[in-house]
A protein has these predicted regions:
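N-terminal Sec/SRP start-transfer signal
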Residues: 1-35, 45, 413, 439, ...
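Short cytosolic juxtamembrane segments of multi-pass membrane proteins
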Residues: 3, 512-529
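Juxtamembrane segments of multi-pass membrane proteins
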Residues: 543-634
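Membrane transport/envelope proteins' first extracytoplasmic loop
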Residues: 2-400, 431, 471, 586, ...
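Small-residue-rich transmembrane alpha-helices
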Residues: 407-412, 417-419, 443-475, 484-511
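Juxtamembrane/interface segments at transmembrane-helix termini
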Residues: 41, 45, 49, 502-515, ...
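Alpha-helical transmembrane segments of integral membrane proteins
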Residues: 22-33, 388-408, 442-453, 486-490, ...
Length: 634
Protein backbone atom coordinates (compact mmCIF):
# COMPACT_ATOMS: atom_id res chain seq x y z
CA UNK A 1 0.00 0.00 0.00
CA UNK A 2 2.75 2.44 0.95
CA UNK A 3 4.65 1.58 -2.23
CA UNK A 4 1.56 2.28 -4.32
CA UNK A 5 0.97 5.63 -2.61
CA UNK A 6 4.61 6.57 -3.09
CA UNK A 7 4.38 5.76 -6.77
CA UNK A 8 1.17 7.73 -7.03
CA UNK A 9 2.82 10.78 -5.42
CA UNK A 10 5.82 10.62 -7.77
CA UNK A 11 3.51 10.10 -10.74
CA UNK A 12 1.51 13.13 -9.68
CA UNK A 13 4.67 15.26 -9.51
CA UNK A 14 5.76 14.13 -12.98
CA UNK A 15 2.34 14.79 -14.45
CA UNK A 16 2.16 18.29 -12.95
CA UNK A 17 5.84 19.17 -12.99
CA UNK A 18 5.21 22.75 -14.06
CA UNK A 19 2.99 23.37 -11.06
CA UNK A 20 5.48 21.70 -8.73
CA UNK A 21 8.30 23.88 -10.06
CA UNK A 22 6.16 27.01 -9.80
CA UNK A 23 5.50 26.34 -6.11
CA UNK A 24 9.15 25.45 -5.55
CA UNK A 25 10.50 28.65 -7.10
CA UNK A 26 7.95 31.00 -5.57
CA UNK A 27 8.78 29.49 -2.17
CA UNK A 28 12.51 29.80 -2.93
CA UNK A 29 12.02 33.45 -3.85
CA UNK A 30 9.91 34.23 -0.80
CA UNK A 31 12.07 32.30 1.68
CA UNK A 32 15.31 33.55 0.16
CA UNK A 33 14.12 37.15 0.16
CA UNK A 34 12.86 36.94 3.73
CA UNK A 35 15.93 35.12 5.04
CA UNK A 36 18.41 37.20 3.04
CA UNK A 37 17.01 40.56 4.07
CA UNK A 38 16.65 39.41 7.67
CA UNK A 39 20.32 38.41 7.65
CA UNK A 40 21.52 41.63 6.01
CA UNK A 41 21.54 43.77 9.15
CA UNK A 42 23.31 41.18 11.36
CA UNK A 43 25.82 40.51 8.57
CA UNK A 44 26.60 44.20 8.09
CA UNK A 45 26.95 44.77 11.82
CA UNK A 46 29.13 41.68 12.19
CA UNK A 47 31.32 42.70 9.26
CA UNK A 48 31.96 46.17 10.70
CA UNK A 49 32.52 44.80 14.22
CA UNK A 50 35.01 42.25 12.93
CA UNK A 51 36.83 44.97 11.00
CA UNK A 52 37.10 47.23 14.06
CA UNK A 53 38.28 44.41 16.30
CA UNK A 54 40.79 43.09 13.77
CA UNK A 55 42.52 46.46 13.46
CA UNK A 56 42.12 47.23 17.17
CA UNK A 57 40.05 50.36 16.92
CA UNK A 58 39.72 52.17 20.21
CA UNK A 59 36.76 51.54 22.50
CA UNK A 60 37.10 54.94 24.16
CA UNK A 61 38.87 58.14 23.14
CA UNK A 62 39.70 60.56 25.97
CA UNK A 63 40.28 64.20 25.04
CA UNK A 64 41.11 67.09 27.37
CA UNK A 65 40.54 70.78 26.83
CA UNK A 66 43.92 71.52 28.49
CA UNK A 67 45.77 68.52 27.07
CA UNK A 68 46.83 65.24 28.64
CA UNK A 69 50.13 64.58 30.41
CA UNK A 70 52.06 61.38 31.00
CA UNK A 71 50.63 61.34 34.53
CA UNK A 72 47.12 61.45 33.09
CA UNK A 73 47.91 58.54 30.77
CA UNK A 74 49.34 56.52 33.67
CA UNK A 75 46.23 57.23 35.75
CA UNK A 76 44.00 56.02 32.91
CA UNK A 77 46.05 52.85 32.50
CA UNK A 78 45.66 52.02 36.20
CA UNK A 79 41.85 51.95 36.04
CA UNK A 80 40.50 48.45 36.56
CA UNK A 81 39.26 47.07 33.25
CA UNK A 82 41.54 49.05 30.91
CA UNK A 83 43.39 46.59 28.69
CA UNK A 84 45.60 48.92 26.66
CA UNK A 85 46.17 52.67 26.28
CA UNK A 86 47.83 54.68 23.54
CA UNK A 87 48.38 58.42 23.89
CA UNK A 88 48.43 60.37 20.64
CA UNK A 89 48.67 63.86 19.24
CA UNK A 90 45.92 64.80 16.80
CA UNK A 91 45.70 68.20 15.16
CA UNK A 92 43.50 69.71 12.46
CA UNK A 93 45.30 71.93 9.96
CA UNK A 94 44.84 73.31 6.46
CA UNK A 95 47.15 71.82 3.83
CA UNK A 96 47.49 72.88 0.21
CA UNK A 97 47.88 70.23 -2.47
CA UNK A 98 49.76 70.59 -5.73
CA UNK A 99 46.64 71.97 -7.42
CA UNK A 100 46.47 74.86 -4.90
CA UNK A 101 43.36 73.39 -3.29
CA UNK A 102 43.10 73.87 0.47
CA UNK A 103 42.24 70.66 2.34
CA UNK A 104 41.17 70.65 5.96
CA UNK A 105 43.28 67.76 7.22
CA UNK A 106 43.16 65.80 10.46
CA UNK A 107 46.69 64.67 11.23
CA UNK A 108 47.12 61.63 13.50
CA UNK A 109 50.64 61.49 14.98
CA UNK A 110 50.62 57.97 16.38
CA UNK A 111 53.13 55.93 14.33
CA UNK A 112 56.36 54.70 15.91
CA UNK A 113 59.75 54.42 14.20
CA UNK A 114 58.65 51.29 12.34
CA UNK A 115 55.46 52.93 11.10
CA UNK A 116 53.35 50.73 13.38
CA UNK A 117 50.82 51.48 16.09
CA UNK A 118 49.39 49.47 18.97
CA UNK A 119 45.83 50.73 18.53
CA UNK A 120 43.90 52.14 15.58
CA UNK A 121 45.82 50.07 13.07
CA UNK A 122 45.11 50.32 9.36
CA UNK A 123 45.48 48.34 6.16
CA UNK A 124 48.07 49.58 3.70
CA UNK A 125 46.41 49.54 0.26
CA UNK A 126 49.13 51.24 -1.81
CA UNK A 127 52.66 52.53 -1.31
CA UNK A 128 54.58 52.21 1.94
CA UNK A 129 54.58 53.46 5.53
CA UNK A 130 56.23 56.76 6.57
CA UNK A 131 59.96 56.54 7.27
CA UNK A 132 60.69 60.20 8.06
CA UNK A 133 58.78 62.91 9.90
CA UNK A 134 57.86 64.72 6.67
CA UNK A 135 56.08 61.69 5.16
CA UNK A 136 52.49 60.55 5.63
CA UNK A 137 49.88 58.05 4.53
CA UNK A 138 46.33 59.17 3.79
CA UNK A 139 42.89 57.59 4.08
CA UNK A 140 41.65 56.09 0.81
CA UNK A 141 38.14 57.59 1.10
CA UNK A 142 39.62 61.05 0.47
CA UNK A 143 39.84 60.25 -3.24
CA UNK A 144 36.10 59.83 -3.66
CA UNK A 145 34.59 63.21 -3.01
CA UNK A 146 37.64 65.47 -2.59
CA UNK A 147 38.55 67.70 -5.52
CA UNK A 148 42.04 66.87 -6.83
CA UNK A 149 42.62 64.42 -4.01
CA UNK A 150 46.29 63.80 -3.18
CA UNK A 151 48.03 60.83 -4.73
CA UNK A 152 51.20 58.96 -3.82
CA UNK A 153 54.17 61.23 -4.42
CA UNK A 154 52.25 64.48 -3.97
CA UNK A 155 53.47 67.09 -1.51
CA UNK A 156 51.10 68.84 0.88
CA UNK A 157 52.12 72.27 2.17
CA UNK A 158 50.93 74.00 5.31
CA UNK A 159 48.60 76.80 4.24
CA UNK A 160 49.04 80.38 5.37
CA UNK A 161 45.39 80.32 6.45
CA UNK A 162 46.01 77.41 8.81
CA UNK A 163 45.59 77.96 12.54
CA UNK A 164 48.38 79.10 14.84
CA UNK A 165 48.61 75.68 16.50
CA UNK A 166 49.57 74.05 13.22
CA UNK A 167 52.37 76.56 12.60
CA UNK A 168 53.60 76.22 16.17
CA UNK A 169 53.52 72.45 16.60
CA UNK A 170 54.18 71.06 13.10
CA UNK A 171 57.85 70.13 12.79
CA UNK A 172 57.69 70.45 9.01
CA UNK A 173 55.74 72.73 6.69
CA UNK A 174 55.38 69.98 4.09
CA UNK A 175 54.18 66.38 4.03
CA UNK A 176 54.85 63.96 1.21
CA UNK A 177 52.26 61.26 0.57
CA UNK A 178 53.92 57.84 0.47
CA UNK A 179 50.95 55.52 0.93
CA UNK A 180 47.19 55.07 0.95
CA UNK A 181 45.50 53.22 3.80
CA UNK A 182 42.08 52.21 5.07
CA UNK A 183 41.38 52.68 8.77
CA UNK A 184 38.35 51.67 10.87
CA UNK A 185 38.43 55.16 12.39
CA UNK A 186 37.47 56.64 9.01
CA UNK A 187 34.95 54.22 7.50
CA UNK A 188 32.54 56.85 6.22
CA UNK A 189 32.88 59.43 3.45
CA UNK A 190 30.73 61.67 5.66
CA UNK A 191 33.09 64.34 6.89
CA UNK A 192 33.85 64.88 10.55
CA UNK A 193 33.43 68.41 11.96
CA UNK A 194 36.56 70.49 12.48
CA UNK A 195 37.58 73.84 13.95
CA UNK A 196 40.04 74.47 11.11
CA UNK A 197 39.55 75.51 7.51
CA UNK A 198 36.12 74.86 6.06
CA UNK A 199 34.80 73.33 9.26
CA UNK A 200 34.74 69.74 7.98
CA UNK A 201 37.58 67.25 7.58
CA UNK A 202 38.37 66.51 3.93
CA UNK A 203 41.47 64.39 4.49
CA UNK A 204 42.90 62.14 7.20
CA UNK A 205 46.67 61.74 7.35
CA UNK A 206 48.77 59.45 9.57
CA UNK A 207 52.30 60.58 10.45
CA UNK A 208 55.10 59.68 12.84
CA UNK A 209 54.99 60.73 16.47
CA UNK A 210 57.75 63.31 16.00
CA UNK A 211 55.78 65.37 13.49
CA UNK A 212 53.77 67.17 16.18
CA UNK A 213 56.02 68.70 18.81
CA UNK A 214 53.64 69.75 21.59
CA UNK A 215 54.65 68.61 25.09
CA UNK A 216 51.20 67.20 25.83
CA UNK A 217 48.81 64.69 24.26
CA UNK A 218 45.51 65.64 22.68
CA UNK A 219 44.00 62.14 22.82
CA UNK A 220 44.34 58.93 24.76
CA UNK A 221 42.90 55.88 23.02
CA UNK A 222 42.14 52.80 25.05
CA UNK A 223 40.77 49.29 24.75
CA UNK A 224 38.45 47.96 27.43
CA UNK A 225 39.14 44.48 28.70
CA UNK A 226 36.75 41.79 27.34
CA UNK A 227 34.93 44.35 25.15
CA UNK A 228 36.19 42.57 22.04
CA UNK A 229 33.94 39.63 22.88
CA UNK A 230 30.83 41.79 22.48
CA UNK A 231 29.18 43.07 19.32
CA UNK A 232 30.06 46.73 18.88
CA UNK A 233 26.51 47.60 17.87
CA UNK A 234 24.76 45.68 20.64
CA UNK A 235 23.12 47.08 23.75
CA UNK A 236 25.38 44.87 25.87
CA UNK A 237 28.47 46.53 24.45
CA UNK A 238 27.01 49.99 24.98
CA UNK A 239 26.21 49.25 28.62
CA UNK A 240 29.64 47.68 29.14
CA UNK A 241 31.44 50.72 27.72
CA UNK A 242 29.21 53.14 29.63
CA UNK A 243 30.48 51.68 32.90
CA UNK A 244 34.07 52.44 31.89
CA UNK A 245 33.05 55.87 30.59
CA UNK A 246 31.65 56.75 34.02
CA UNK A 247 34.96 55.79 35.67
CA UNK A 248 36.92 57.93 33.23
CA UNK A 249 34.65 60.93 33.73
CA UNK A 250 35.11 60.65 37.49
CA UNK A 251 38.89 60.49 37.04
CA UNK A 252 38.73 63.39 34.60
CA UNK A 253 37.08 65.67 37.14
CA UNK A 254 40.13 65.25 39.39
CA UNK A 255 42.88 65.20 36.80
CA UNK A 256 41.56 68.17 34.83
CA UNK A 257 41.72 70.46 37.86
CA UNK A 258 45.28 69.30 38.60
CA UNK A 259 46.24 70.04 35.02
CA UNK A 260 44.71 73.52 35.30
CA UNK A 261 46.67 74.23 38.51
CA UNK A 262 49.85 73.01 36.84
CA UNK A 263 49.35 75.31 33.86
CA UNK A 264 48.57 78.26 36.13
CA UNK A 265 51.77 77.68 38.11
CA UNK A 266 53.83 77.37 34.93
CA UNK A 267 52.27 80.51 33.54
CA UNK A 268 52.88 82.43 36.74
CA UNK A 269 56.54 81.42 36.75
CA UNK A 270 56.97 82.48 33.14
CA UNK A 271 55.29 85.83 33.78
CA UNK A 272 57.45 86.43 36.86
CA UNK A 273 60.55 85.57 34.87
CA UNK A 274 59.53 87.94 32.08
CA UNK A 275 58.81 90.70 34.60
CA UNK A 276 62.21 90.22 36.24
CA UNK A 277 63.91 90.35 32.86
CA UNK A 278 62.09 93.55 31.98
CA UNK A 279 63.05 95.15 35.30
CA UNK A 280 66.71 94.29 34.81
CA UNK A 281 66.51 95.51 31.24
CA UNK A 282 65.12 98.86 32.38
CA UNK A 283 67.89 99.13 34.98
CA UNK A 284 70.59 98.50 32.38
CA UNK A 285 69.11 101.06 30.00
CA UNK A 286 68.97 103.64 32.80
CA UNK A 287 72.65 103.06 33.68
CA UNK A 288 73.74 103.39 30.06
CA UNK A 289 71.84 106.65 29.74
CA UNK A 290 73.55 108.13 32.82
CA UNK A 291 76.97 107.10 31.50
CA UNK A 292 76.27 108.74 28.18
CA UNK A 293 75.25 111.98 29.87
CA UNK A 294 78.47 112.02 31.97
CA UNK A 295 80.51 111.52 28.84
CA UNK A 296 78.77 114.47 27.22
CA UNK A 297 79.67 116.72 30.15
CA UNK A 298 83.28 115.69 29.91
CA UNK A 299 83.28 116.37 26.19
CA UNK A 300 82.12 119.92 26.82
CA UNK A 301 85.07 120.48 29.13
CA UNK A 302 87.47 119.82 26.26
CA UNK A 303 86.51 123.14 24.72
CA UNK A 304 88.36 124.93 27.52
CA UNK A 305 91.62 123.23 26.54
CA UNK A 306 91.63 124.60 22.99
CA UNK A 307 94.84 126.54 23.50
CA UNK A 308 96.58 123.52 24.86
CA UNK A 309 95.42 121.52 21.88
CA UNK A 310 96.92 124.00 19.47
CA UNK A 311 100.24 124.03 21.30
CA UNK A 312 100.61 120.27 21.67
CA UNK A 313 99.81 118.22 18.46
CA UNK A 314 100.13 114.82 20.11
CA UNK A 315 97.66 115.76 22.81
CA UNK A 316 95.39 117.22 20.16
CA UNK A 317 95.30 113.92 18.29
CA UNK A 318 94.33 112.01 21.43
CA UNK A 319 91.60 114.49 22.32
CA UNK A 320 90.14 114.29 18.81
CA UNK A 321 89.91 110.53 19.07
CA UNK A 322 88.31 110.84 22.48
CA UNK A 323 85.79 113.36 21.22
CA UNK A 324 84.85 111.10 18.32
CA UNK A 325 84.31 108.15 20.65
CA UNK A 326 82.17 110.29 22.91
CA UNK A 327 80.09 111.42 19.94
CA UNK A 328 79.51 107.84 18.83
CA UNK A 329 78.57 106.88 22.36
CA UNK A 330 76.07 109.70 22.54
CA UNK A 331 74.48 108.70 19.24
CA UNK A 332 74.38 105.02 20.23
CA UNK A 333 72.93 105.80 23.62
CA UNK A 334 70.20 107.89 22.05
CA UNK A 335 69.31 105.17 19.57
CA UNK A 336 69.48 102.41 22.22
CA UNK A 337 67.21 104.38 24.47
CA UNK A 338 64.52 104.66 21.80
CA UNK A 339 64.79 100.98 20.81
CA UNK A 340 64.85 99.90 24.41
CA UNK A 341 61.76 101.91 25.19
CA UNK A 342 59.91 100.27 22.29
CA UNK A 343 61.06 96.85 23.45
CA UNK A 344 59.92 97.57 26.98
CA UNK A 345 56.49 98.51 25.68
CA UNK A 346 56.31 95.27 23.72
CA UNK A 347 57.36 93.30 26.78
CA UNK A 348 54.69 95.00 28.85
CA UNK A 349 52.07 94.16 26.23
CA UNK A 350 53.23 90.53 26.05
CA UNK A 351 53.15 90.23 29.82
CA UNK A 352 49.65 91.70 29.90
CA UNK A 353 48.47 89.24 27.22
CA UNK A 354 50.05 86.36 29.10
CA UNK A 355 48.34 87.47 32.30
CA UNK A 356 44.98 87.63 30.52
CA UNK A 357 45.55 84.16 29.08
CA UNK A 358 46.51 82.89 32.51
CA UNK A 359 43.39 84.40 34.04
CA UNK A 360 41.32 82.77 31.28
CA UNK A 361 42.46 79.25 32.10
CA UNK A 362 39.43 77.44 33.42
CA UNK A 363 39.28 74.26 35.41
CA UNK A 364 39.37 72.22 32.21
CA UNK A 365 37.42 69.08 31.42
CA UNK A 366 37.84 65.65 29.90
CA UNK A 367 35.79 64.66 26.87
CA UNK A 368 35.18 60.92 26.93
CA UNK A 369 34.07 59.68 23.51
CA UNK A 370 33.20 56.17 22.41
CA UNK A 371 32.93 54.56 18.99
CA UNK A 372 29.28 55.58 18.88
CA UNK A 373 30.30 59.26 18.94
CA UNK A 374 32.18 59.09 15.63
CA UNK A 375 30.31 60.26 12.54
CA UNK A 376 31.13 57.15 10.53
CA UNK A 377 29.95 54.76 13.24
CA UNK A 378 26.71 56.65 13.89
CA UNK A 379 25.81 56.97 10.20
CA UNK A 380 26.60 53.34 9.51
CA UNK A 381 24.45 52.17 12.40
CA UNK A 382 21.54 54.38 11.31
CA UNK A 383 21.68 53.11 7.72
CA UNK A 384 21.84 49.46 8.76
CA UNK A 385 18.88 49.97 11.09
CA UNK A 386 16.94 51.46 8.17
CA UNK A 387 17.68 48.34 6.16
CA UNK A 388 16.46 46.27 9.08
CA UNK A 389 13.21 48.26 9.18
CA UNK A 390 12.64 47.70 5.45
CA UNK A 391 13.30 43.99 5.91
CA UNK A 392 10.33 43.77 8.24
CA UNK A 393 7.94 44.94 5.51
CA UNK A 394 9.12 43.98 2.02
CA UNK A 395 9.46 40.20 2.51
CA UNK A 396 5.82 40.03 3.61
CA UNK A 397 4.71 40.82 0.07
CA UNK A 398 6.73 37.94 -1.34
CA UNK A 399 5.48 35.66 1.40
CA UNK A 400 1.88 36.62 0.62
CA UNK A 401 2.42 36.04 -3.10
CA UNK A 402 3.89 32.61 -2.34
CA UNK A 403 0.79 31.69 -0.33
CA UNK A 404 -1.52 32.85 -3.11
CA UNK A 405 0.39 30.89 -5.74
CA UNK A 406 0.36 27.76 -3.59
CA UNK A 407 -3.35 28.13 -2.86
CA UNK A 408 -4.23 28.66 -6.53
CA UNK A 409 -2.03 25.83 -7.76
CA UNK A 410 -3.21 23.27 -5.22
CA UNK A 411 -6.86 24.25 -5.69
CA UNK A 412 -6.67 23.65 -9.43
CA UNK A 413 -4.73 20.41 -8.97
CA UNK A 414 -7.30 19.04 -6.55
CA UNK A 415 -10.21 20.13 -8.73
CA UNK A 416 -8.70 18.28 -11.68
CA UNK A 417 -8.45 15.08 -9.63
CA UNK A 418 -11.94 15.08 -8.21
CA UNK A 419 -12.78 11.77 -9.86
CA UNK A 420 -9.68 10.07 -8.48
CA UNK A 421 -10.35 11.46 -5.00
CA UNK A 422 -13.97 10.27 -5.15
CA UNK A 423 -12.87 6.78 -6.20
CA UNK A 424 -10.39 6.54 -3.33
CA UNK A 425 -13.03 7.68 -0.85
CA UNK A 426 -15.42 5.05 -2.20
CA UNK A 427 -12.73 2.39 -1.72
CA UNK A 428 -12.51 3.28 1.98
CA UNK A 429 -9.51 5.59 2.16
CA UNK A 430 -9.76 8.21 4.84
CA UNK A 431 -9.53 11.90 4.09
CA UNK A 432 -6.04 12.16 5.62
CA UNK A 433 -4.82 9.21 3.59
CA UNK A 434 -6.12 10.81 0.41
CA UNK A 435 -5.07 14.36 1.03
CA UNK A 436 -1.80 13.34 2.62
CA UNK A 437 -0.61 12.85 -0.95
CA UNK A 438 -1.23 16.53 -1.74
CA UNK A 439 0.21 17.65 1.57
CA UNK A 440 3.40 15.71 0.80
CA UNK A 441 3.31 17.21 -2.70
CA UNK A 442 3.28 20.79 -1.40
CA UNK A 443 5.58 19.93 1.53
CA UNK A 444 8.31 18.58 -0.75
CA UNK A 445 8.04 21.67 -2.98
CA UNK A 446 8.19 23.96 0.06
CA UNK A 447 11.17 22.18 1.65
CA UNK A 448 13.17 22.17 -1.58
CA UNK A 449 12.19 25.79 -2.20
CA UNK A 450 13.36 26.83 1.27
CA UNK A 451 16.66 25.00 0.80
CA UNK A 452 17.31 26.71 -2.53
CA UNK A 453 16.15 30.06 -1.19
CA UNK A 454 18.42 29.86 1.84
CA UNK A 455 21.45 28.89 -0.24
CA UNK A 456 20.97 31.88 -2.50
CA UNK A 457 19.35 34.37 -0.14
CA UNK A 458 21.92 34.28 2.65
CA UNK A 459 24.71 34.99 0.15
CA UNK A 460 23.07 37.16 -2.49
CA UNK A 461 21.00 39.80 -0.70
CA UNK A 462 23.46 40.78 2.09
CA UNK A 463 26.33 40.93 -0.40
CA UNK A 464 24.41 43.07 -2.89
CA UNK A 465 23.15 45.49 -0.24
CA UNK A 466 26.58 45.74 1.39
CA UNK A 467 28.11 46.46 -2.02
CA UNK A 468 25.55 49.20 -2.58
CA UNK A 469 26.68 50.86 0.65
CA UNK A 470 30.30 50.49 -0.50
CA UNK A 471 30.08 53.90 -2.14
CA UNK A 472 29.55 55.44 1.30
CA UNK A 473 31.75 53.30 3.54
CA UNK A 474 35.20 51.75 3.28
CA UNK A 475 34.68 48.27 4.69
CA UNK A 476 36.14 44.89 3.71
CA UNK A 477 34.08 42.39 1.68
CA UNK A 478 31.34 40.61 3.60
CA UNK A 479 31.47 36.90 4.43
CA UNK A 480 27.65 36.50 4.52
CA UNK A 481 27.53 33.24 6.52
CA UNK A 482 24.61 30.84 6.74
CA UNK A 483 22.50 31.78 9.77
CA UNK A 484 20.70 28.77 11.30
CA UNK A 485 18.71 30.93 13.72
CA UNK A 486 17.08 32.87 10.89
CA UNK A 487 16.62 29.71 8.80
CA UNK A 488 14.88 27.96 11.70
CA UNK A 489 12.55 30.93 12.00
CA UNK A 490 11.79 31.43 8.31
CA UNK A 491 11.45 27.77 7.30
CA UNK A 492 8.58 26.84 9.67
CA UNK A 493 6.69 30.01 8.78
CA UNK A 494 7.07 29.45 5.04
CA UNK A 495 6.41 25.72 5.06
CA UNK A 496 3.54 26.13 7.51
CA UNK A 497 1.95 28.77 5.28
CA UNK A 498 2.17 26.53 2.21
CA UNK A 499 0.71 23.57 4.11
CA UNK A 500 -2.08 25.77 5.45
CA UNK A 501 -2.94 26.84 1.90
CA UNK A 502 -2.96 23.19 0.82
CA UNK A 503 -5.23 22.13 3.68
CA UNK A 504 -7.56 25.01 2.85
CA UNK A 505 -7.75 23.83 -0.77
CA UNK A 506 -8.50 20.27 0.38
CA UNK A 507 -11.14 21.30 2.90
CA UNK A 508 -13.93 22.02 0.42
CA UNK A 509 -13.41 18.66 -1.29
CA UNK A 510 -13.41 16.75 2.00
CA UNK A 511 -17.03 17.72 2.65
CA UNK A 512 -18.29 16.21 -0.63
CA UNK A 513 -19.59 12.62 -0.93
CA UNK A 514 -17.81 10.11 -3.22
CA UNK A 515 -20.70 10.11 -5.70
CA UNK A 516 -20.49 13.89 -6.06
CA UNK A 517 -16.74 13.80 -6.49
CA UNK A 518 -16.86 11.13 -9.22
CA UNK A 519 -19.19 13.33 -11.24
CA UNK A 520 -17.83 16.34 -13.13
CA UNK A 521 -18.20 19.48 -11.09
CA UNK A 522 -20.94 21.74 -12.27
CA UNK A 523 -19.67 25.12 -13.40
CA UNK A 524 -20.34 28.08 -11.21
CA UNK A 525 -23.78 29.56 -11.95
CA UNK A 526 -23.81 32.71 -13.97
CA UNK A 527 -25.34 35.83 -12.49
CA UNK A 528 -26.40 39.14 -13.82
CA UNK A 529 -23.85 41.78 -13.04
CA UNK A 530 -24.27 45.45 -12.41
CA UNK A 531 -23.21 46.46 -15.91
CA UNK A 532 -26.18 44.60 -17.40
CA UNK A 533 -28.43 47.13 -15.71
CA UNK A 534 -26.83 49.84 -17.84
CA UNK A 535 -28.15 48.96 -21.34
CA UNK A 536 -26.38 51.83 -23.04
CA UNK A 537 -23.00 50.48 -21.95
CA UNK A 538 -23.77 46.74 -22.01
CA UNK A 539 -25.08 46.71 -25.60
CA UNK A 540 -21.88 48.31 -26.89
CA UNK A 541 -19.62 45.61 -25.38
CA UNK A 542 -18.44 42.66 -27.48
CA UNK A 543 -19.22 39.05 -26.59
CA UNK A 544 -15.71 38.44 -25.23
CA UNK A 545 -15.91 41.54 -23.08
CA UNK A 546 -19.26 40.45 -21.67
CA UNK A 547 -17.94 36.95 -20.86
CA UNK A 548 -14.86 38.40 -19.21
CA UNK A 549 -16.90 40.73 -17.04
CA UNK A 550 -19.22 37.93 -15.96
CA UNK A 551 -16.31 35.58 -15.16
CA UNK A 552 -14.70 38.23 -12.98
CA UNK A 553 -17.60 37.99 -10.57
CA UNK A 554 -18.29 34.32 -11.26
CA UNK A 555 -14.91 33.15 -9.93
CA UNK A 556 -14.40 35.48 -7.00
CA UNK A 557 -11.50 33.52 -5.48
CA UNK A 558 -9.42 33.88 -8.61
CA UNK A 559 -10.42 37.53 -8.86
CA UNK A 560 -9.24 38.41 -5.36
CA UNK A 561 -6.04 36.38 -5.64
CA UNK A 562 -5.19 38.15 -8.87
CA UNK A 563 -5.98 41.55 -7.41
CA UNK A 564 -3.94 40.94 -4.26
CA UNK A 565 -1.01 39.54 -6.24
CA UNK A 566 -0.96 42.42 -8.67
CA UNK A 567 -1.40 44.92 -5.85
CA UNK A 568 1.58 43.49 -3.98
CA UNK A 569 3.83 43.46 -7.03
CA UNK A 570 2.75 46.97 -8.00
CA UNK A 571 3.39 48.18 -4.46
CA UNK A 572 6.92 46.77 -4.55
CA UNK A 573 7.67 48.40 -7.89
CA UNK A 574 6.14 51.69 -6.80
CA UNK A 575 8.13 51.64 -3.57
CA UNK A 576 11.36 50.97 -5.46
CA UNK A 577 10.80 53.82 -7.89
CA UNK A 578 9.69 56.04 -5.02
CA UNK A 579 12.88 55.38 -3.08
CA UNK A 580 14.98 56.15 -6.14
CA UNK A 581 13.14 59.39 -6.89
CA UNK A 582 13.22 60.45 -3.23
CA UNK A 583 16.96 59.92 -3.00
CA UNK A 584 17.56 61.71 -6.31
CA UNK A 585 15.59 64.74 -5.12
CA UNK A 586 17.44 65.13 -1.82
CA UNK A 587 20.32 67.12 -3.29
CA UNK A 588 18.03 69.42 -5.29
CA UNK A 589 15.71 70.10 -2.37
CA UNK A 590 18.62 70.64 0.02
CA UNK A 591 20.51 73.15 -2.11
CA UNK A 592 17.74 74.33 -4.41
CA UNK A 593 14.93 75.01 -1.94
CA UNK A 594 16.33 74.91 1.62
CA UNK A 595 19.97 76.10 1.62
CA UNK A 596 19.83 78.95 -0.88
CA UNK A 597 23.46 80.05 -0.60
CA UNK A 598 26.86 79.24 -2.05
CA UNK A 599 28.97 80.34 0.92
CA UNK A 600 28.56 80.56 4.68
CA UNK A 601 30.62 82.83 6.95
CA UNK A 602 30.57 82.29 10.71
CA UNK A 603 31.59 85.30 12.81
CA UNK A 604 32.86 85.09 16.38
CA UNK A 605 31.07 88.28 17.40
CA UNK A 606 27.45 89.11 16.63
CA UNK A 607 28.42 92.81 16.47
CA UNK A 608 31.27 92.22 14.03
CA UNK A 609 29.49 93.88 11.11
CA UNK A 610 28.78 97.04 13.09
CA UNK A 611 32.28 97.20 14.58
CA UNK A 612 34.26 96.28 11.47
CA UNK A 613 33.81 99.03 8.88
CA UNK A 614 35.73 97.13 6.21
CA UNK A 615 33.55 94.04 6.59
CA UNK A 616 30.41 96.16 6.63
CA UNK A 617 31.47 97.94 3.45
CA UNK A 618 32.18 94.62 1.75
CA UNK A 619 28.80 93.13 2.62
CA UNK A 620 26.90 96.26 1.60
CA UNK A 621 28.81 96.79 -1.65
CA UNK A 622 27.36 96.17 -5.10
CA UNK A 623 28.28 92.51 -5.21
CA UNK A 624 26.38 90.21 -7.61
CA UNK A 625 24.85 88.35 -4.71
CA UNK A 626 22.50 88.72 -1.79
CA UNK A 627 23.70 88.71 1.81
CA UNK A 628 21.66 87.70 4.83
CA UNK A 629 23.16 87.85 8.30
CA UNK A 630 22.60 85.16 10.88
CA UNK A 631 24.94 84.72 13.81
CA UNK A 632 25.70 81.91 16.15
CA UNK A 633 28.14 82.00 19.02
CA UNK A 634 31.14 79.75 19.21
Amino acid sequence: MKSARRKNILRGIRQSLNRFISILFIVALGAGFLAGLSATSPDMFENADKYMDEYRMYDIDVKATLGLTNSDVDAIAQIDGVALVQPARVLDMVLVNEHDNELTTRVFALLDNDGATDLNQFELKEGRLPETIDECVIQSSAGRYTLNAPQIGDTLTLAESSNDSASEYASSNTLRVVGIVESPMCISVEREPSTAGTGSVALQAFVRNEFLTMDFYTDCYLLVQDAVQLDTFSDEYTAFIDDMTAKLETLGDKRASLRADELREQGKQEIDSAQAFMNSFESVIGTRTELAEDAAMRAKQTAAAAALINSNPELAQKLVATAKAVGDALSSASDDKENAQARIERLNADIADAQNALDGIGDGTWLVRTRADSVGYANYKDNVEKVSALCKVFPMFFFLVALLVALTTMTRLIEERRTQIGTLKALGYTDWQIFGEYILYSLSAAVLGCAIGFLGGFKLFPTVINSAYGMMYTLPPMDAPFRPDIALLVAPVTIGGILLATVWACYSVCRSRPAQLMQPKAPAPGKRIFLEHIPTLWKRMSFTQKVTCRNLFRYKKRLFMTIIGMAGCSALMLTGFGLRDSIDDIVYKQFGEIDLYQMSIVLNDANAIDNDTELKALLTSDMPCSVKSRFRSR
